[in-house]
């Protein structure tokens, strides 16, 4: 996945000056970040490395642990994200355990838990962690309020996208184009906060990909 995705992200030249490494095995997530970072003219590469996730109730702590682990392995400026779906009627479940819950009970399992629930308020959150030895560890967060749909809708996106409708839209994330989703999503909001900060840096040297 990494090679194909890096070809998609960086089309010009075999030796590109890179500024950071995005660590993720999720192609959809990488494509969402890619579209936003291209708006800022950032060059980066994707590393499909499995960064371990600690069991914690705070997305920021999970992202913090993962980014430091990734840096120890790669020794390059690294960016790692953790995200979660927080459903009010389920007391914030699945929250920071969203990936595990999706893999075990999936979208249908969440809808089953929500059977008969009228108030379907939910929130997607993102914690985006960056680390370089020339900067302190930084975490950027983003959130979007919305609601859980009555049934899965759409074929785009990934994870719980087919059942989440952000406020201000009648579509689920899975029914949106990439451009539409990036106008609403928690991930896009965190990414833009990071990008606004990162573009001001003067001290990071480029790294290179052959």
Q: Can you annotate each of these PLM segments?
A:
Residues 1-15, 209:
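N-terminal amphipathic/basic-hydrophobic helices that include classical n-h-c signal peptides
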Residues 7, 24-26:
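Short helix-onset patch at the extreme N-terminus, typifying the N->h transition
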Residues 17-21, 28-210:
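Anionic-ligand binding patches
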């Amino acid at each position: 996945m990494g090679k194909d995705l890096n070809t998609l992200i960086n089309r010009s030249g075999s030796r590109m000056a890179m500024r950071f490494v995005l660590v993720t095995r999720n192609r959809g997530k990488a494509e969402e970040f890619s579209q936003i970072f291209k708006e800022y003219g950032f060059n980066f590469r994707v590393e499909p490395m499995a960064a371990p996730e600690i069991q914690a109730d705070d997305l920021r702590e999970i992202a913090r642990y993962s980014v430091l682990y990734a840096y120890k392995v790669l020794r390059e400026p690294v960016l790692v994200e953790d995200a979660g779906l927080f459903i009010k009627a389920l007391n914030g479940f699945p929250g920071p355990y969203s990936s595990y819950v999706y893999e075990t009970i999936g979208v249908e399992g969440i809808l089953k838990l929500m059977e008969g629930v009228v108030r379907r308020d939910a929130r997607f959150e993102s914690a985006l962690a960056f680390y370089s030895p020339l900067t302190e560890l930084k975490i950027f967060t983003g959130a979007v309020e919305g609601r859980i749909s009555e049934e899965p809708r759409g074929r785009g996106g990934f994870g719980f996208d087919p059942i989440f409708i952000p406020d201000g839209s009648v579509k689920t994330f899975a029914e949106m184009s990439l451009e539409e989703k990036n106008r609403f999503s928690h991930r896009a909001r965190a990414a833009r906060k990071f990008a606004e900060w990162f573009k001001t840096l003067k001290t990071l040297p480029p790294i290179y990909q052959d």
